[in-house]
Amino acid sequence: MDLLQYTFFQHALLGSLLASIAYGIIGTYIVTRRLVFISGGITHASFGGIGLGLFAGISPILSAAVFSVLSAFGVEWLSRRKDMREDSAIAVFWTLGMALGIMFSFLSPGFAPDLSAYLFGNILTINQADLWMLGILAFILTGFFYLFIRPIVSIAFDREFARSQKIPVEVFEYVLMMFIALTIVACLRMVGIVLAISLLTIPQMTANLFTYSFKKIIWLSIGIGFLGCLGGLFISYHWKVPSGASIIFFSILIYAVCKIGKSCCKKQS
Protein backbone atom coordinates (compact mmCIF):
# COMPACT_ATOMS: atom_id res chain seq x y z
CA MET A 1 0.00 0.00 0.00
CA ASP A 2 3.02 2.26 -0.26
CA LEU A 3 1.57 3.49 -3.55
CA LEU A 4 -1.08 5.49 -1.70
CA GLN A 5 1.61 7.79 -0.36
CA TYR A 6 2.36 9.15 -3.82
CA THR A 7 0.39 12.16 -5.05
CA PHE A 8 0.25 10.90 -8.65
CA PHE A 9 -1.36 7.65 -7.48
CA GLN A 10 -3.88 9.51 -5.32
CA HIS A 11 -4.79 11.58 -8.37
CA ALA A 12 -5.14 8.39 -10.40
CA LEU A 13 -7.50 6.84 -7.84
CA LEU A 14 -9.70 9.94 -7.61
CA GLY A 15 -9.66 10.31 -11.39
CA SER A 16 -10.72 6.67 -11.74
CA LEU A 17 -13.70 7.21 -9.45
CA LEU A 18 -14.85 10.40 -11.18
CA ALA A 19 -14.36 8.91 -14.64
CA SER A 20 -16.27 5.78 -13.62
CA ILE A 21 -19.21 7.95 -12.56
CA ALA A 22 -19.22 9.86 -15.85
CA TYR A 23 -18.70 6.79 -18.02
CA GLY A 24 -21.18 4.72 -16.02
CA ILE A 25 -23.94 7.29 -16.50
CA ILE A 26 -23.49 8.28 -20.14
CA GLY A 27 -22.30 4.80 -21.18
CA THR A 28 -25.59 3.27 -20.04
CA TYR A 29 -27.46 5.61 -22.37
CA ILE A 30 -25.04 4.79 -25.21
CA VAL A 31 -25.45 1.03 -24.86
CA THR A 32 -29.22 1.18 -24.37
CA ARG A 33 -29.69 3.56 -27.28
CA ARG A 34 -27.22 1.52 -29.39
CA LEU A 35 -24.91 4.45 -30.09
CA VAL A 36 -21.62 2.56 -29.70
CA PHE A 37 -20.56 3.10 -33.32
CA ILE A 38 -21.44 6.80 -33.14
CA SER A 39 -19.43 7.14 -29.94
CA GLY A 40 -16.47 5.47 -31.63
CA GLY A 41 -16.71 8.00 -34.43
CA ILE A 42 -16.77 10.92 -32.01
CA THR A 43 -13.81 9.45 -30.11
CA HIS A 44 -11.64 9.27 -33.21
CA ALA A 45 -12.91 12.62 -34.50
CA SER A 46 -11.55 14.22 -31.31
CA PHE A 47 -8.05 13.60 -32.66
CA GLY A 48 -8.68 16.44 -35.10
CA GLY A 49 -9.19 18.80 -32.17
CA ILE A 50 -6.01 17.57 -30.52
CA GLY A 51 -4.00 18.24 -33.66
CA LEU A 52 -5.58 21.67 -34.03
CA GLY A 53 -4.71 22.52 -30.42
CA LEU A 54 -1.09 21.49 -30.89
CA PHE A 55 -0.87 23.53 -34.09
CA ALA A 56 -2.49 26.64 -32.57
CA GLY A 57 -0.57 26.43 -29.31
CA ILE A 58 -3.65 26.06 -27.12
CA SER A 59 -4.78 23.28 -24.80
CA PRO A 60 -5.30 20.13 -26.92
CA ILE A 61 -8.00 18.93 -24.50
CA LEU A 62 -9.94 22.19 -24.87
CA SER A 63 -9.74 22.14 -28.67
CA ALA A 64 -10.61 18.43 -28.68
CA ALA A 65 -13.71 19.16 -26.58
CA VAL A 66 -14.93 21.84 -29.00
CA PHE A 67 -14.12 19.71 -32.06
CA SER A 68 -15.81 16.63 -30.56
CA VAL A 69 -19.00 18.48 -29.65
CA LEU A 70 -19.23 19.98 -33.14
CA SER A 71 -18.56 16.55 -34.66
CA ALA A 72 -21.27 15.02 -32.47
CA PHE A 73 -23.75 17.67 -33.59
CA GLY A 74 -22.65 17.14 -37.19
CA VAL A 75 -23.24 13.39 -36.99
CA GLU A 76 -26.62 13.92 -35.34
CA TRP A 77 -27.66 16.46 -38.00
CA LEU A 78 -26.45 14.45 -40.98
CA SER A 79 -27.99 11.23 -39.71
CA ARG A 80 -31.41 12.93 -39.71
CA ARG A 81 -31.13 13.80 -43.40
CA LYS A 82 -32.78 11.41 -45.83
CA ASP A 83 -29.95 11.64 -48.36
CA MET A 84 -27.26 10.25 -46.01
CA ARG A 85 -27.13 7.10 -43.93
CA GLU A 86 -26.07 7.31 -40.30
CA ASP A 87 -23.05 5.02 -40.70
CA SER A 88 -21.85 7.13 -43.65
CA ALA A 89 -22.10 10.32 -41.58
CA ILE A 90 -20.09 8.68 -38.80
CA ALA A 91 -17.42 7.55 -41.25
CA VAL A 92 -17.06 11.10 -42.61
CA PHE A 93 -16.33 12.66 -39.21
CA TRP A 94 -14.28 9.66 -38.03
CA THR A 95 -11.85 9.84 -40.94
CA LEU A 96 -11.91 13.65 -41.17
CA GLY A 97 -10.92 13.98 -37.52
CA MET A 98 -8.07 11.50 -37.81
CA ALA A 99 -6.80 13.09 -41.03
CA LEU A 100 -6.88 16.63 -39.62
CA GLY A 101 -5.26 15.47 -36.40
CA ILE A 102 -2.31 13.92 -38.21
CA MET A 103 -1.89 16.88 -40.56
CA PHE A 104 -2.02 19.56 -37.85
CA SER A 105 0.26 17.55 -35.56
CA PHE A 106 3.00 17.40 -38.16
CA LEU A 107 2.48 21.06 -39.09
CA SER A 108 2.94 22.13 -35.47
CA PRO A 109 5.98 24.39 -34.94
CA GLY A 110 8.99 23.00 -33.12
CA PHE A 111 9.60 19.35 -32.39
CA ALA A 112 7.06 16.75 -33.48
CA PRO A 113 4.67 16.23 -30.54
CA ASP A 114 4.33 12.89 -28.75
CA LEU A 115 0.90 11.67 -29.78
CA SER A 116 1.03 8.40 -27.85
CA ALA A 117 -0.25 10.12 -24.69
CA TYR A 118 -3.45 11.04 -26.52
CA LEU A 119 -3.76 7.81 -28.49
CA PHE A 120 -3.21 5.38 -25.60
CA GLY A 121 -3.47 7.54 -22.47
CA ASN A 122 -1.78 7.31 -19.09
CA ILE A 123 -3.93 7.74 -16.01
CA LEU A 124 -0.84 8.26 -13.85
CA THR A 125 -0.21 11.61 -15.57
CA ILE A 126 -3.54 13.27 -14.76
CA ASN A 127 -3.26 16.47 -12.73
CA GLN A 128 -5.53 18.65 -10.61
CA ALA A 129 -6.95 20.41 -13.67
CA ASP A 130 -8.01 17.04 -15.10
CA LEU A 131 -9.60 16.11 -11.77
CA TRP A 132 -11.56 19.36 -11.66
CA MET A 133 -12.78 18.74 -15.21
CA LEU A 134 -13.84 15.18 -14.40
CA GLY A 135 -15.45 16.26 -11.14
CA ILE A 136 -17.51 19.03 -12.73
CA LEU A 137 -18.58 16.74 -15.58
CA ALA A 138 -19.56 13.93 -13.19
CA PHE A 139 -21.55 16.40 -11.06
CA ILE A 140 -23.41 17.86 -14.05
CA LEU A 141 -24.15 14.43 -15.52
CA THR A 142 -25.44 13.15 -12.18
CA GLY A 143 -27.71 16.16 -11.78
CA PHE A 144 -28.97 16.02 -15.37
CA PHE A 145 -29.84 12.32 -15.23
CA TYR A 146 -31.41 12.71 -11.78
CA LEU A 147 -33.71 15.47 -13.04
CA PHE A 148 -34.55 13.97 -16.44
CA ILE A 149 -34.20 10.22 -15.95
CA ARG A 150 -37.74 9.45 -17.15
CA PRO A 151 -37.54 11.23 -20.53
CA ILE A 152 -33.99 9.90 -21.03
CA VAL A 153 -35.15 6.31 -20.46
CA SER A 154 -38.12 6.84 -22.78
CA ILE A 155 -35.86 8.17 -25.54
CA ALA A 156 -33.30 5.41 -25.02
CA PHE A 157 -35.85 2.62 -25.40
CA ASP A 158 -38.49 4.06 -27.74
CA ARG A 159 -38.14 7.45 -29.44
CA GLU A 160 -41.60 7.30 -31.01
CA PHE A 161 -43.24 6.66 -27.65
CA ALA A 162 -41.26 9.56 -26.20
CA ARG A 163 -42.55 11.83 -28.97
CA SER A 164 -46.11 10.72 -28.25
CA GLN A 165 -45.57 11.85 -24.66
CA LYS A 166 -44.66 15.36 -25.89
CA ILE A 167 -41.01 14.94 -24.87
CA PRO A 168 -38.65 17.20 -26.90
CA VAL A 169 -36.70 14.23 -28.26
CA GLU A 170 -34.42 16.22 -30.59
CA VAL A 171 -33.37 18.62 -27.84
CA PHE A 172 -32.53 15.79 -25.46
CA GLU A 173 -30.63 13.90 -28.15
CA TYR A 174 -28.44 16.89 -28.98
CA VAL A 175 -27.74 17.56 -25.30
CA LEU A 176 -26.88 13.91 -24.69
CA MET A 177 -24.62 13.85 -27.75
CA MET A 178 -22.80 16.84 -26.27
CA PHE A 179 -22.36 14.96 -22.99
CA ILE A 180 -21.05 11.92 -24.86
CA ALA A 181 -18.43 14.06 -26.61
CA LEU A 182 -17.38 15.84 -23.40
CA THR A 183 -17.14 12.59 -21.44
CA ILE A 184 -14.95 11.02 -24.11
CA VAL A 185 -12.59 14.01 -24.15
CA ALA A 186 -12.47 14.27 -20.36
CA CYS A 187 -11.18 10.71 -20.13
CA LEU A 188 -8.66 10.81 -23.00
CA ARG A 189 -5.81 11.24 -20.53
CA MET A 190 -6.84 7.97 -18.90
CA VAL A 191 -7.08 5.46 -21.74
CA GLY A 192 -6.57 7.48 -24.93
CA ILE A 193 -8.47 7.67 -28.19
CA VAL A 194 -7.83 4.07 -29.20
CA LEU A 195 -9.32 2.52 -26.05
CA ALA A 196 -11.84 5.13 -24.84
CA ILE A 197 -14.83 3.39 -26.43
CA SER A 198 -14.19 0.35 -24.23
CA LEU A 199 -14.93 2.26 -21.01
CA LEU A 200 -18.26 3.32 -22.49
CA THR A 201 -19.40 -0.25 -23.18
CA ILE A 202 -17.63 -2.98 -21.18
CA PRO A 203 -18.90 -2.04 -17.67
CA GLN A 204 -22.42 -1.71 -19.07
CA MET A 205 -22.16 -5.09 -20.81
CA THR A 206 -21.07 -6.64 -17.52
CA ALA A 207 -23.86 -4.95 -15.57
CA ASN A 208 -26.39 -6.07 -18.16
CA LEU A 209 -25.60 -9.68 -17.29
CA PHE A 210 -27.32 -9.16 -13.93
CA THR A 211 -30.08 -6.63 -14.58
CA TYR A 212 -32.09 -4.93 -17.32
CA SER A 213 -33.07 -1.93 -15.20
CA PHE A 214 -31.64 1.32 -16.59
CA LYS A 215 -30.98 2.77 -13.13
CA LYS A 216 -29.41 -0.42 -11.77
CA ILE A 217 -27.15 -0.69 -14.82
CA ILE A 218 -25.88 2.84 -14.11
CA TRP A 219 -25.01 1.98 -10.50
CA LEU A 220 -23.43 -1.36 -11.39
CA SER A 221 -21.50 0.20 -14.28
CA ILE A 222 -19.98 2.80 -11.97
CA GLY A 223 -18.85 0.12 -9.53
CA ILE A 224 -17.56 -2.24 -12.22
CA GLY A 225 -15.80 0.59 -14.03
CA PHE A 226 -14.06 1.71 -10.83
CA LEU A 227 -13.04 -1.87 -10.05
CA GLY A 228 -11.62 -2.20 -13.57
CA CYS A 229 -9.60 0.98 -13.10
CA LEU A 230 -8.23 -0.19 -9.75
CA GLY A 231 -7.22 -3.57 -11.12
CA GLY A 232 -5.70 -1.98 -14.21
CA LEU A 233 -3.70 0.46 -12.10
CA PHE A 234 -2.12 -2.29 -10.02
CA ILE A 235 -1.40 -4.39 -13.13
CA SER A 236 0.23 -1.35 -14.72
CA TYR A 237 2.37 -0.73 -11.65
CA HIS A 238 3.53 -4.29 -11.08
CA TRP A 239 3.99 -5.34 -14.73
CA LYS A 240 5.28 -1.97 -15.95
CA VAL A 241 2.75 -1.83 -18.81
CA PRO A 242 0.66 1.15 -20.04
CA SER A 243 -2.17 1.92 -17.65
CA GLY A 244 -4.81 2.48 -20.34
CA ALA A 245 -4.35 -0.96 -21.86
CA SER A 246 -4.20 -2.66 -18.45
CA ILE A 247 -7.46 -0.99 -17.36
CA ILE A 248 -9.26 -2.25 -20.45
CA PHE A 249 -7.69 -5.71 -20.08
CA PHE A 250 -8.85 -6.02 -16.47
CA SER A 251 -12.33 -4.72 -17.37
CA ILE A 252 -12.69 -7.37 -20.07
CA LEU A 253 -11.41 -9.97 -17.60
CA ILE A 254 -14.18 -8.97 -15.17
CA TYR A 255 -16.75 -9.34 -17.96
CA ALA A 256 -15.41 -12.77 -18.95
CA VAL A 257 -15.45 -14.04 -15.35
CA CYS A 258 -19.01 -12.77 -14.82
CA LYS A 259 -20.18 -14.24 -18.12
CA ILE A 260 -18.66 -17.65 -17.39
CA GLY A 261 -19.95 -17.58 -13.81
CA LYS A 262 -23.49 -16.79 -14.95
CA SER A 263 -23.37 -19.57 -17.57
CA CYS A 264 -22.19 -22.08 -14.95
CA CYS A 265 -24.98 -21.05 -12.57
CA LYS A 266 -27.56 -21.52 -15.33
CA LYS A 267 -26.29 -25.02 -16.11
CA GLN A 268 -26.39 -26.05 -12.45
CA SER A 269 -29.93 -24.76 -12.03
Predicted segments with their positions:
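Hydrophobic alpha-helical transmembrane segments
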Residues: 13-18, 61-66, 91-92, 131-136, ...
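Alpha-helical transmembrane segments in multi-pass membrane proteins
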Residues: 15-24, 45, 49, 53, ...
